[in-house]
């Protein structure tokens, strides 16, 4: 899995939680590329306190409106931790290819990722409908 290198901003809390999540990750070798992409993103992201993150940044549990650049179809997704992921309900795991591609990007950015089947995907972030930090929830 390849994730385009883009400027990423993460809250310090999300960063710590994701590092801990990766330490406990017991998935097999089939997820090595995905794991490396997440580790690279965590290593290079700009970290900010939760109270200082801009409202246009995709953080954990942000609900985002995406536009598929191939089909033009719009879709709303919520970025979640694996235990809360329900893809059919629009909750995608941060450890999924699309979840990793979205985290830390801003409205107007294009997220690019490869599906497990090798299909290249791209979607523009049109809006953030909900971001916990903008609502005063700094511990979600």
What kind of feature is each model-predicted range?
Residues 45-46, 106, 132:
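Conserved NTP-handling cores and scaffolds of large molecular machines
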Residues 61-63, 70-120:
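Non-DNA-binding regulatory cores of transcription-related proteins
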Residues 16, 77, 123:
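A broad, low-specificity signal marking well-ordered, structured residues that form hydrophobic/aromatic
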Residues 23, 69, 130:
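Residue-level marker of positions within ordered structural domains that often coincide
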Residues 6, 122-124:
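Acidic/glycine-rich phosphate/pyrophosphate-binding loops and surrounding catalytic core
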Residues 1-55:
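N-terminal intrinsically disordered, low-complexity, charge/repeat-rich segments that act as generic
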Residues 36-81:
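Long amphipathic N-terminal alpha/beta scaffold segment
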Residues 126-140:
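Short peripheral tails and domain-boundary helices/loops at the edges of structured domains
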């Amino acid at each position: 899995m390849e994730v385009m290198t883009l400027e990423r901003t993460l809250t310090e809390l999300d960063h710590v939680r994701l590092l801990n999540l990766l330490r406990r990750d017991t998935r097999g070798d089939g997820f090595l590329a995905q794991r490396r992409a997440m580790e690279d993103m965590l290593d290079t992201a700009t970290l900010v306190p939760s109270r200082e993150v801009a409202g246009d940044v995709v953080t954990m549990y942000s609900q985002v409106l995406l536009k598929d650049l191939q089909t033009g179809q719009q879709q709303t997704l919520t970025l979640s931790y694996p235990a809360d992921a329900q893809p059919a309900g629009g909750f995608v795991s941060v450890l999924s290819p699309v979840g990793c591609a979205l985290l830390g990007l801003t409205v107007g950015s294009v997220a690019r990722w490869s599906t497990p089947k090798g299909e290249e995907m791209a979607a523009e972030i049109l809006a953030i409908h909900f971001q916990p930090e903008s609502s005063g929830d700094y511990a979600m």
